[in-house]
Structure formats: structure tokens, C-alpha cells
Amino acid sequence: MERTSKYAEAIDTASQPETVIRASSVTGQQGHLNSVDMPLVETWRPEGPRASQQNHILLSPEQEVSQSSNTSPTSESDPQAFLEASEFPQNQTKTSRVDPVHMEIDDWAAIDQPMADSAQPDFEDWGDLGDLMPEVLPESSGTSSGAATDNGTAADDENRCWDHGCNGKKFLNHSNLVRHRRENGSARPKFICPMCGAYFSRSTARNQHLEKKSCNRVRRYSNGRERPRLRVKD
């Protein structure tokens, strides 16, 4: 029982790099494991990061100090030494940039002079165009005003009624003119006052006329012309 438990313990501890030395030391001291079982523990070699950890563990303190002293300086520990060891030194990298062309003050003045002369426009050639502008503007404004007046007179003529004895009665808009023609047309019945013979396009207007007893009042158009009185047939 003791032999099997120690064998299982040695196999479990072999999965870590630190336990390899421990397993070999246990087998060396006690000698209970067989010679066939020894290579299973001693010949195992970890790979990758574990190998570096094992190598680090196996080194003695004196070897670690000597190895750390022999390491070369890197760019992180000493950037100046890294630049000196490289092919392109620091001074050469700074001077590798292309500087702008340096010119003297006299050269800049000679270049600016023709540019300043060409930037100034020549106003002498604009005299004819300036004389024509005042003459063109009034003509354009006059034509626009004339077109506006023509449109206004045409609209006024369209909103006038020359039928039904209206003698060119003017309405505010076209819709009022259409309603006037519909009310005074032959298709719509006319409501006549039985007292004076006046006719109305709506029954409400005829009834108000009778209530106010305005039969003796002379009825006139909006332009002041007297309306003809219709005679009621017996």
C-alpha cells in the first residue's frame, strides 16, 4: 500500500515543472520505485513557457547573477545605447528630414513684386460697362411694372358682370362672380315680392324684404343705377 501511494503521488506531481526535481529526489533517497518506472518521471520535458520556468528553477543563484550581468541593454532599459548600436544613429535620423528651401529676403521681394502687380485689376476697361448699367435697369423695371398693370386690368375685366342688367358690376374675386351668375341665371328660380314686384335670388332675402316693409324704397344697383320694377301679372 505504501509503495502504490508513493507511486501515485510521484505521477501526480510530475505534471508541474517544480515537481520534477522533487520526484527524482524522492526516488533517489528512498529507492522504492522500480528502474522501469524511473524514465517515466525523469524523461518528461515541458515545452514552451514551462521549459523556461524549469530552466530558471534549475539555475543556481550565482548563475542567475552572471546571466543577468551578461545580457545586452535593450531599447527599453537604455534607448541611447540601442540607437548607437543600430545602423542608423540618432543624429542621422534627425537630419534625414527634408527642410524647406531657404531663400533670401531679396529673392522673396523679387517674386512678390510681379504677383502684386498682376493681382491689381485694371478698372479703366470697365468704364463702358458702368455707363450702360444705369440705362438697362430702368427699362427692366418699367417692363415688369407694365406687365403687372396689364395683369391687374385683365383680372378686373374678368371679375365684372355685363349681363342681367349689371352694366359691368365689379366683384372682389372670381368665385363671387360665379355665384352671382348662378343666382341670376335662368336655371335658378327667382323669388318675387307680391307687394312691389321686386325679385330676389334667395327666399330668405325676399322674406326679410317683406318683414322690413321696404317695398316703397327704390332699389338700386351697386353702381347707383335704378333697378327696373317688375309688374305682377293679374
UniProtKB/Swiss-Prot annotation:
Keywords: Metal-binding, Nucleus, Repeat, Transcription, Transcription regulation, Zinc, Zinc-finger. The keyword Nucleus applies. One of its GO terms (molecular function) is zinc ion binding. InterPro entries: Znf_C2H2_sf (IPR036236). Disulfide bonds: none annotated. One of its GO terms (cellular component) is nucleus. Coiled coil: none annotated. A zinc finger (C2H2-type) spans 159-184, 191-223. Residues 45-99, 118-154 are annotated as: Disordered. Residues 66-77, 140-154 have a biased composition (Low complexity). It is found in: Nucleus. Transcription factor that probably regulates the expression of the gene cluster that mediates the biosynthesis of squalestatin S1 (SQS1, also known as zaragozic acid A), a heavily oxidized fungal polyketide that offers potent cholesterol lowering activity by targeting squalene synthase (SS). Belongs to the GLI C2H2-type zinc-finger protein family. This is C2H2-type zinc-finger transcription factor clz7. The gene is clz7.
